[in-house]
Regions:
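Polytopic membrane enzymes that build or remodel cell-surface glycoconjugates and lipids
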Residues: 2-480, 484-508, 526-539, 543
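C-terminal luminal/periplasmic domains and tails of membrane-associated envelope-modifying transferases
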Residues: 3, 7, 450-701
Length: 701
């Protein structure tokens, strides 16, 4: 779409780009050999959401038999009770292609993420070098060397910022990095052509189709058209002062029209899907509290994280500070700051000819808009805060600050210029050192969870990471000493959880009724936190003792109000009820749970209930098919389907779902069952297909 290297015309500029690319690579090169972490990266190496195809033909088979409308639940019982169903057709196809290329080798994913980060760093450098020079005052200009030095320092300042470590080293984050790369290309294109009042029709069509890709790949790019609009309107005021505001506005809107049409199509698609969100706000007061009380405190947390990136952890959600009531000083301060910021942005929008207004708008506007999807303003999401959410907002903030630096440097004498550059270099050096230390935290699972344990904000998160560390040592270590240490960590986690239950009981009696509705809606109140603690306690104890009765007794007192309980907690509780043959109680829970949350577990257990208690095989089949429709790649659903048809002597369907399970899990045993059954049914086509997969898996093994 853009001939980037038309811009790179002289050796000096090429040298700047080369320095940036080499330094970014050298800084992160040691991370390429990092192993898988026992974290969300299990999604890849355990193939828990999608299988890893062995060939392109296998991708076609997956699409043929399973389809591309796959959903997965985005939730974390320890972060919040918010739960979202996610999944787009493009996401499924794209992941299949990536998995086909990289298989289960962590090096491939780390290299891919690093390449994307280098490309994003290059594009940032390109924008700073070619676009931001426009904002240097002509009267007291800075030298070309100083300009390029500032560009290098600011680019590396972003590339080495500590909050970006998670985005780069978290192997499952490649989709977001690609989305940001595509968004950066769009921004660069518009900045490069901002002097043109109109865009040719064929380029409008290309932009329209192009923007659909990042939209359907990742919803993080929904505010891109408004971000581009900010840059366009600001640039018009700077370089075309004779043109009026109305003409500026109309021209900018015309230029982003293809992006707005793409966004409109995405929004229509998004809201046309059934059960997009499994937890919904039905109270206007809760929504208002989320936007004007909750979001400002999340925003303030991100500002502190950018300026002082000291407390870095995968559990950043737990570090967000919320007031205990609506009118506490900190909450009021955050809300007022948030509202004033929005008002100042609006005022600066109409006063861009003034330097102060322009600088405020160009620094804060794009940054704020890019952060908006993560502030819980547009919609509630399960993860309250995460370091990786700052990747793109911080990049746009860097562009704005660089504009300010250029204006500042071109307004002061040489001695002050040197001082400003020196201070900037020192700040970047400090943050780079912190980033390198943070990168070492990610070297393996043990160090990652140890770092999270050190930053644990409360007993729940402390016990959670103790449980992870204990499980890693107990389950995966080969030495007796390590297994013993793992057992000790698990015991410590259990003791911590019992203490937490008592502490939360005191807090519940003290200020449960003072808390805002939005805090309760997110499950951050003592009552809901007790349920989370009980869940982790039951989960840990059943893993050690295998005692489902004891686990049931721990969880039972906290399962009265299912509307505040996360899906994973409900799933464990239902499993415990079935293990203890409490079918009536399980049915009561299921009938309540299925109204609030849909998951493979609730649907498959409902199927079991219909079959075991009521002997109603049609309803049992209905729930299994409903689960398969929403979650076609879900292993639990496929397991229950083939078992159901085997028990009901439906051999054709048994063969079919055995085949699906076999290709989903690369299971030779199930493919053999499928082959034998298809042979007995004289279905030579599917029998041959099963045999081909058996041979393919044999060769791969």
């Amino acid at each position: 779409m853009i001939k980037l290297f038309d811009i790179v015309k002289n050796l000096n500029n090429k040298l700047v780009y080369l320095i940036v690319v080499l330094m970014v690579f050298m800084f992160y090169a040691h991370t390429l050999n990092y192993p898988w972490r026992y974290f969300d990266e299990r999604i890849i190496y355990d193939e828990s959401i999608l299988p890893i195809p062995r060939s392109f033909l296998e991708i076609l088979d997956y699409i043929k038999y399973f389809g591309i409308h796959n959903h997965f639940e985005a939730s974390n019982p320890f972060y919040s009770t918010i739960s979202n169903l996610r999944g787009t057709p493009l996401d499924v196809v794209f992941n299949f292609i990536v998995f086909l290329c990289f298989k289960k080798n962590p090096f491939n994913y780390h290299l891919f993420s690093l390449i994307l980060h280098i490309l994003n760093s290059f594009l940032l450098c390109l924008i700073l070098l070619t676009h931001c020079k426009t904002y240097i005052k002509k009267s007291l200009s800075i030298s070309d060397f100083q300009r390029k030095a500032v560009v290098i320092v600011m680019t590396l300042g972003w590339a080495f910022h500590p909050t970006n470590i998670e985005s780069i080293l978290f192997a499952t984050n490649f989709g977001a990095l690609i989305t940001y790369f595509l968004c950066l290309l769009v921004i660069f294109y518009y900045l490069k052509n901002s002097g043109n009042k109109t865009i040719p029709i064929h380029l409008n069509i290309i932009l329209f189709l192009y923007y659909l890709f990042p939209l359907f790949l990742n919803e993080y790019s929904v505010t891109l058209p408004i971000i581009v609009f900010c840059y366009l309107i600001a640039n018009y005021y700077l370089v075309q002062e004779e043109v009026g505001f109305k003409n500026h506005l109309i021209s900018a809107l015309k230029q982003i029209t293809p992006l707005l049409i793409s966004l409109m199509i995405f929004v229509i698609y998004f809201f046309s899907l059934p059960a997009i969100r499994t937890t919904q706000e039905k109270n206007l007061i809760v929504s208002l509290e989320r936007v004007f009380w909750f979001a400002p405190q999340v925003f303030m947390h991100y500002i502190k994280l950018i300026l002082f990136p000291l407390h870095l952890t995968i559990d950043q959600t737990g570090l967000v500070q919320f007031s205990e009531s609506l009118f506490k000083p900190y909450a009021i301060f955050c809300s007022i700051t948030f509202i004033i910021l929005c008002l100042f942005l609006l005022i600066s929008f109409f006063n861009l000819k003034k330097n102060t207004a322009y600088l405020f708008f160009i620094i804060i506007g794009p940054f704020f808009l890019s952060l908006l999807p993560f502030l819980h303003v547009l919609s509630p999401t399960y993860c309250i805060a995460s370091e990786r959410y700052l990747y793109f907002p911080l990049l746009l903030l860097t562009i704005g600050i660089t504009n300010f630096l250029f204006l500042l440097l071109s307004s002061i004498n040489k001695n002050k210029q040197k001082l400003v550059i020196l201070v900037t270099v020192l700040l970047v050096t400090l943050t780079s050192c912190r980033a390198y230390a943070r990168a070492l935290d990610w070297k393996d699972s043990y160090s990652l969870f140890t770092s999270a344990l050190k930053e644990a904000p409360n007993d729940l998160f402390k016990a959670l990471r103790l449980e992870f560390l204990g499980s890693i040592l107990f389950d995966y270590s080969n030495t007796t000493a390590s297994k013993q240490k793992g057992q000790e960590l698990l015991t410590t986690a259990i003791d911590t959880l019992y203490n937490s239950l008592l502490d939360l009981e005191y807090k519940k009696l003290t200020y449960q009724n003072q808390l805002t509705l939005i805090i309760k809606s997110y499950g951050l109140d003592p009552k809901t936190m007790q349920a989370k603690v009980a869940y982790l306690l039951a989960f840990t104890k059943i893993g050690i003792d295998k005692d489902s009765i004891s686990a049931y007794q721990i969880l039972k007192p906290h399962m009265e109000d299912l509307s505040i309980i996360d899906t994973q907690i409900i799933d464990l509780y239902l499993g415990l009820l079935f293990n203890n043959y409490l079918f009536d109680k399980a049915e009561e829970i299921l009938n309540k749970a299925i109204k609030h949350r849909i998951s493979p577990t609730t649907l498959t257990i409902m199927s079991q209930l219909q079959a075991l208690k009521y002997k109603d095989m049609k309803k049992a089949e209905h729930y299994l098919k409903a689960s398969f429709k929403l979650f076609p790649y879900d292993v639990q659903t496929l397991t229950y389907l083939k078992s159901f048809y085997q028990q009901t002597n439906n051999y054709e369907q048994f063969a079919y779902y055995s085949f699906l399970y076999g290709i989903r899990m690369h299971s030779i045993e199930d493919l053999k069952n499928s082959y034998k059954t298809y042979v007995s049914l004289n279905n030579t086509v599917m029998a041959k297909k099963s045999l081909e997969y058996i041979s393919s898996i044999d060769k791969a093994n």
